[in-house]
Amino acid sequence: MNITIHRGANQIGGCITEISSDNCKLLIDFGSNLPGNQKAELTEKQICDIAGSADAVFYTHYHGDHVGLHHLIPASIKQYIGAGAKDIMLCKYDALNQHGDYGKEIEMV
């Protein structure tokens, strides 16, 4: 078993951790950087390199630095979050939808 911390060890936020074996790759969180963070956001290629072969993504909670890039995970990869956290995310996106369409981003989780 291998554990790789892609982001979050040397910064606050933007957490992405990989747990893998010969036949399985799981990601824990896929967060965006916190505002004001001096680290560059991931490129599309970096996101594909990290998430492309994952079997699933599990989110620890609904804060943006843990789920902020969930909408960039390929649709073929299953994503999981607790029911309470999902309800909070849906409430947030429902409120935001009054000013734009954010629904497609949350449907994947």
Description of each model-found segment:
Residues G68-S76:
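Metal-dependent catalytic neighborhoods of phosphoester/phosphodiester hydrolases
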